[in-house]
Design a protein with these regions (language model features):
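Junction motif at the cytosolic side of a transmembrane helix
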Residues: 2-10, 207, 211, 272-295
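A structural motif at transmembrane helix-loop-helix junctions in multipass membrane proteins
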Residues: 111, 187-226
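Transmembrane helix boundary and interhelical loop/hinge segments in multi-pass membrane proteins
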Residues: 105-123, 139, 293-295
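Secretory targeting signals
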Residues: 3-21, 52, 56-106, 136-202, ...
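Transmembrane helix segments
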Residues: 57-67, 212-248
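Membrane-interface helix starts
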Residues: 35-51
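Hydrophobic/aromatic residues in alpha-helical transmembrane segments
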Residues: 104-108, 156, 204, 224, ...
């Protein structure tokens, strides 16, 4: 069922004679129907299950493995056994590079291109729903989807981590310790920071989704954009470009685990995310507002 079908079912008697409701009511109904559509797709449910499985597998692997000498891996992995909250942090560090962007690619590909591909976009616009409002709802649903994706990693990771490795004071990257309640709050801040980064990437995906009627093509294009961004970020000769890459400061979420928090990179990262969100949403709006809906 598409968003158009869901919206029509929610208001079957809508017509010219129906009393006009306040502007925010249909917008809220459309958002709810869009979220139900996103949450109800089996592909999305399977994707969330895969995201949630990674921290569980990591925690079990660390639990059953023999302790050995520290290697060159992230500090989060070496600290997992000391506090279960390092499990979601380590899992987020792994999944933010590929799995979470892949999830956002699939969601953003379905946003506009998916509706056009199955022939419901034109009907959705005759409900009536203004194109600008529709695009805002689509992007807001992608932002909520980003939070869902990050939570699908962090929440199971925290639960399995606490169950296997316990709680207690968390040793920050600065070397001192903070109580468990403060540590949970730091994990929440990390979740919000990474969700903001994925929301910036989702704006790029939404723009790409307005350029085609093939959702798979839109998803692949966004993944190519993400991979190229990571590659460019790893090339020292392109240092002048690094501050402008949406992925450049994603891994700076470690600064939120220092005491006190080092906010310079985090603030810069949020500003870059906001810039991507504004610029690419406006590009999507410019394209979508003039798009000839033929399907």
């Amino acid at each position: 069922m598409s968003a158009a079908d869901t919206l029509a079912a929610a208001d079957p008697a809508a017509g010219p004679s129906t009393r006009r409701a306040p502007a925010w009511v249909p917008s809220t109904r459309l958002l709810r129907s869009e979220l139900r559509l996103v949450a109800g797709r089996r592909r999305n449910q399977a994707g969330l299950a895969v995201l949630a499985a990674v921290p569980i597998v990591m925690a079990i692997a660390v639990k059953v493995s023999r302790p050995g000498a520290a290697g060159d891996g992230p500090d989060f992995f070496g600290s997992i056994t000391s506090n279960g909250l390092f499990v979601p942090l380590a899992a987020l560090g792994v999944e933010i590079t590929m799995f979470l962007p892949l999830a956002m690619s699939m969601l953003s590909g379905d946003a506009i291109a998916g509706e056009a591909n199955i022939g419901t976009l034109r009907y959705l616009l005759t409900v009536p729903v203004h194109r600008t409002r529709l695009l805002l709802v689509k992007y807001l649903s992608l932002c909520i989807g980003a939070v869902w994706g990050v939570a699908a990693v962090a929440v199971p990771g925290a639960l399995i981590g606490v169950a296997l490795f316990g709680t207690g004071q968390l040793t920050t990257l600065s070397g001192d310790q903070i109580p468990f309640g403060a540590a949970v709050w730091r994990v929440v801040l990390v979740m919000l920071y990474l969700s903001a980064g994925l929301a910036g990437l989702a704006a790029v995906g939404l723009f790409i989704s307005t350029l085609t009627e093939q959702p798979i093509a839109a998803a692949i294009a966004l993944m190519i954009f993400t991979i190229v961004s990571w590659i460019a970020d790893s090339v020292p000769q392109l240092g002048w470009l690094h501050p402008w890459l949406v992925v450049h400061l994603w891994l700076s979420f470690g600064d939120l685990l220092r005491n006190p928090i080092e906010g310079a990179n985090v603030t810069q990262g949020l500003l870059v995310d906001l810039g991507y969100a504004v610029v690419f949403w406006l590009l999507a709006w410019a394209r979508f507002s003039e798009k000839d809906i033929t399907s």
